[in-house]
Design a protein with these regions (language model features):
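C-terminal catalytic "cap/lid" subdomain
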Residues: 1-239
């Protein structure tokens, strides 16, 4: 078994990545493949917190643009993350793991209310903790929510599993000359306006000296490779 580099992680998975080619809803083949890798990490002794976006059901900014009040659209987006969290918790339990959903918004019939101490206790007990409902406030992305939870649980690293395999100098889908970076500093990402995540999330990570790893979820084994310190995607850290 490979040596573990990051003992406690916050893994952020985009909702779209779990939707597969349908781009909406959940592709349970993908969900189960991710669960198997999470199980591999947990079996290796990794304490794992998880944030899942809601874009496979609803994207507040995009789907609600010019159609509804922004805070209402964001509320729907937060509820979408709860749907994903419940589904993934169910899948994790079917794989033999103990999972808990902690929501930033109280909804006691569906999941527990988040507190930092509850999350820390569950992680120390070996449970997978899924953080739902973002920050509980509109105008903040799930990426920002993921960084916030990563800071709160004192994660060794925040792993951003997305549909792109790292951070590029430009959009690789538009610019064929775009170059992928192996490592960057937070200052470089912000100064170059690179599309790693939103500025709020990036600044929060920088201010709290977090290591951020951006990589593709296309091969879920990348999660375990990153945990073991392999060079996958792009690492963002301090100078």
């Amino acid at each position: 078994m490979s040596e573990i580099k990051y003992k406690r992680i916050l893994l952020k998975i985009s909702g779209e990545a779990l939707a597969g080619e349908a781009h909406r809803g959940l592709d349970f083949e993908i969900v189960n493949s991710v669960c198997r890798v999470i199980q591999k990490c947990v079996d290796a002794g990794v304490q794992l917190g998880l944030v899942i976006g809601g874009g496979n059901f609803w994207r507040g900014v995009k789907d609600g643009a010019d159609k509804m009040q922004r805070s209402h659209g964001d509320a729907m987006g937060m509820l979408a993350t709860v749907m994903n969290a419940i589904a993934v918790a169910d899948a994790l339990e079917k794989h033999g793991m103990d999972a808990r959903v902690l929501s930033a918004v109280e909804m006691n019939k569906f999941c527990e209310y988040f507190t930092r101490d509850t999350a820390d206790r569950y992680l120390n007990e070996g449970k997978v903790v899924i953080f739902a409902a973002g920050t509980g406030n509109p105008y903040f992305s799930t990426d920002t929510g993921a960084v916030l939870r990563g800071v709160e649980i004192e994660a060794d690293a925040i792993l951003m599993a997305k549909n792109v395999d790292g951070i590029y100098s430009a959009d690789p889908n538009v610019d064929p000359t775009a170059v992928k970076f192996d490592t960057l500093t937070y200052d470089e990402v912000l100064a170059r306006h690179l599309k790693a995540t939103d500025t709020t999330a990036m600044t929060l990570a920088m201010d709290n000296h977090m290591t951020l790893v951006c990589f593709a979820l296309k091969d879920p084994e990348n999660i375990y490779r990153v945990v073991c310190g392999q060079t996958i995607g792009t690492i963002v850290k301090e100078d």
